Amino acid sequence: MSSGAWAAATGLLAAVASVASDVHAGDALDEDVLAVTRKHCVMCHARVPSHPSFDAPPKQVVLESIGELKAWAPKILEQVVWDRNMPIGNDTGMTEEERGLLERWIETLK
């Protein structure tokens, strides 16, 4: 293999490794976000809420999957991160670190 072909192959491998690393990091961040929303959100914002005050998700907002969280990301940023209206009364004790994680995750979606 010529030195030019070798350099091209090495560059291609580095690019593939970088993309794979980014995908893995994104998956890990998604899992962290899901853990936060399971802890603080889905008792109300589930297809079948477990919170005794709700028979259906408030305002039909379901936050059980990454796809649903992505769809609601602008509202999550507003209600949870900026205005701190959610969780209601912060009954579940969401921390600033958890709010920061949600904000960083939402930034990756842009």
Predicted segment positions?
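Aromatic- and Gly/Pro-enriched helix-to-coil junctions and flexible linker segments
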Residues: 16-110
